[in-house]
């Protein structure tokens, strides 16, 4: 068997292809091991940036929870806001304040009856559905 330049170059090319394919399989098969991100899926976790809520985009709160007012066991008061701090309910919605069984006060935006008469949505139905979701 004679060693010639074409045979050596072909053997080296095949060897290079095999090494590259084996190396790439590790990245494609196990994307979170080693250098995650190279030829793999993006990081699947929480973003470092705050997501845009409906209040940030439209300047008002849509149907649903607007704020929660909690009093901790140590007496510390905390307000959790789902919308912007000073955002009002969107047009056609009114703000309703209520209290959960555990003593947490919350405000939510529900359809206004006078505005919703043009549609088939009743404010009391939406309010009861949202309230039942909160109690779960």
UniProtKB/Swiss-Prot annotation:
Keyword Secreted included in the entry's annotation: yes
Transmembrane segments: none
A GO cellular-component term linked to this record: extracellular region
Parts forming coiled coils: none
Keywords of the record: Amidation, Neuropeptide, Secreted, Signal
Keyword Thylakoid: no
Span of the signal peptide: 1-24
GO biological process: neuropeptide signaling pathway
Pro-peptide region(s): 47-136
Residue numbers of Methionine amide PTMs: 33, 44
Tree of life domain: Eukaryota
Localization of this protein: Secreted
Function: The cardioactive peptides enhance the contractions of the auricle in vitro.
Family: Belongs to the SCP family.
Descriptive protein name: Small cardioactive peptides
Organism: Lymnaea stagnalis
Gene: SCP
